[in-house]
UniProtKB/Swiss-Prot annotation:
Residues 1-14 have a biased composition (Polar residues). The keyword Ribosomal protein applies. The N-terminal domain interacts with the head of the 30S subunit; the C-terminal domain interacts with the body and contacts protein S4. The interaction surface between S4 and S5 is involved in control of translational fidelity. This is Small ribosomal subunit protein uS5.
């Protein structure tokens, strides 16, 4: 006679998990903590939180959001004699401007070309000057500049003339925002001397408004001395913005 308490294959009781086994599975499935005690995604030692690396860093805007026109005028290879021999590098000449009457030039040296250009660009941004423009397209009056053996002549031009300039001088006027000008350079073809002479001539530019304030007169009075009628002088004086 079979024992009534014996269990057959079909009458096996359900197995129950021991508390130790349940805790072991939960512990094995839990994420590992960082070295500092925090989780992988947070906590003090986490990758994205606490003292971890910040990913929301923004680059500094050195120009205050202003868009500048950058012109690479000249680049040449230079060498420096040191105790162990010669050390070669590159020198760059860059002109920058906002196209609205401000421009500057800079010179930079480095072992690599991109670094030399970046140095020259940074120097040009720090040396920008304001040049008054007539109608926002040409110079108010003629001017001359001199540096080294170079002499440059700048002349204002009527609308539609364009930029009559070559080489380094064209880059200056394009970045400055001048649309009509006639220039001439004699004495040198060195781009450094030409650029410096050009900026010397631009630095001497004055507007009728500044001259009138310095003399204590009206702008129309200065224009009438050029032979213009009263009505034409007043209309031209009203059009002067700087």
């Amino acid at each position: 006679m079979a024992d009534e308490n014996s269990t057959g294959p079909g009458n096996q009781p359900e197995a129950t998990l021991a508390p130790e086994a349940t805790n072991a599975e939960v512990t094995s499935q839990a994420p590992r903590r960082g070295r500092g005690g925090g989780g992988r995604d947070g906590g003090r030692g986490g990758r994205d939180g606490g003292r971890g690396r910040r990913d929301d860093r923004r680059p500094r805007d050195e120009d205050g959001g202003e868009e500048l026109i950058e012109k690479l005028v000249h680049i040449n290879r230079v060498s420096k004699t040191v105790k162990g021999g010669k050390r070669f590098g590159f020198a760059a000449l860059v002109v920058v401007g906002d196209g609205k009457g401000r421009a500057g030039f800079g010179h930079g040296k480095a072992r690599e070309v991109p670094e030399a250009i970046s140095k020259a660009t940074a120097a040009a941004k720090k040396a920008m000057i304001r040049v008054p423009l007539r109608d926002g397209r040409t110079l108010h009056h003629d001017g001359r500049g001199h540096f080294g053996a170079g002499n440059v002549t700048l002349r204002s031009a009527p609308a539609g003339t364009g930029i009559i300039a070559g080489g380094p001088m064209r880059a200056v006027f394009e970045s400055l925002g001048v649309a009509d000008v006639v220039t001439k350079s004699v004495g040198t073809s060195n781009p450094y001397n030409m650029i410096r002479a050009t900026f010397e001539a631009l630095g001497e530019q004055t507007s009728p408004k500044s001259v009138a304030q310095r003399r204590g007169k009206k702008v129309s009075d200065l224009i009438k001395r050029g032979g213009a009628s009263d009505r034409a002088a007043e209309a031209e004086a009203a059009a002067v913005t700087e």
